Structure formats: structure tokens, C-alpha cells
């Protein structure tokens, strides 16, 4: 019974790490990759 709980814990940990790395990678891709050309800087567009 203890092995099953440990296995579930590791599976959940691996899933959480995978999701975290996936979201981080997607954010970096969006910020610095090809989609970044479509991003607009509101501070540069705003005239004082």
C-alpha cells in the first residue's frame, strides 16, 4: 500500500513539473520567439 501512494506522489510531482516547464517554455517562446513581433509596448505608444 505504501508503494502505491509513493507512485502516485511521484506521478503528481512529474505532472506538476512538466506543466511548470511547459508554461515557462511557452512564455519564453511568446516573449522572445517569432510571436514577439506581434506584441506591442503600451509605454512606447503612449504620448505624454
UniProtKB/Swiss-Prot annotation:
Chain segments annotated as transmembrane: 12-34
Annotated membrane topology: Single-pass membrane protein
InterPro entries: PSII_PsbN (IPR003398)
GO BP, one annotated term: photosynthesis
Signal peptide: none
Cellular component terms (Gene Ontology): plasma membrane-derived thylakoid membrane
Keywords: Membrane, Thylakoid, Transmembrane, Transmembrane helix
Location, primary (coarse class): membrane
A Pfam family it matches: PsbN
Localization (cell): Cellular thylakoid membrane
Job of this protein: May play a role in photosystem I and II biogenesis.
Family to which this protein belongs: Belongs to the PsbN family.
Protein name as annotated: Protein PsbN
Species of provenance: Prochlorococcus marinus (strain MIT 9313)
Gene: psbN
